[in-house]
Amino acid sequence: MAEVIILPEDYWVFDFTRGGDPDFECPFPYQIGRYDEIRPGMYDQAIFEGKRDLHVGIDIGTPVGEPVHAFGAGVVHSLGINDEPGSYGPTIIIKHELDGKPIWALYGHLSMESLQMVEQGMNIAEGQIIATVGDKSVNGGWEPHLHFQLSWDEPTGNDMPGVVARDDRDWALEKFPDPRIVLGPIY
């Protein structure tokens, strides 16, 4: 399987279990935000309904414009803009196969130009550049990063909840498996 972001040897792994620190300046240009992590106080936008703070994807912080690669061969399921404050902004979902089963991968917080790089129904090769990472002005208001998430269930649109309520943890972890099954041991 291909890396979705080509990571350097050294990068930062965040611990957001005590929330984010707005004054912290990461000493590395590449960072990881963990899967299955409760992140108190980080999601105050309306779409999170005041109760969703369990992150069910992996975030890979990068410089703006960093190429995003498909982890495996697949077909573009959908693409579009999730434009609510705090959402993904430009988003691409690709249907892949893993161990003979269909699995959908969401690539979120992309650049606007990414939506011109692929089209719905397009065949994608393993490792193909499908997008680039967007900046805060288009990606929902977040520092530049790729939100990468898997789903065993076909999405009904061009979205998946990347953050769920703590009460939904068991259901969410079953539906949205740990992305390290395709990313490898990145932390």
Q: For each predicted feature, which ranges?
A:
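Acidic, glycine-rich catalytic/binding loops that coordinate metals and/or anionic ligands
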Residues: M1-I5, Q116-V138, W142-Y187
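Histidine-centered active-site/metal-ligand motif
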Residues: H55, H96, H109, H145-H147
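Short beta-strand micro-motifs in enzyme catalytic cores
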Residues: I58, P90-I92, P144-L146
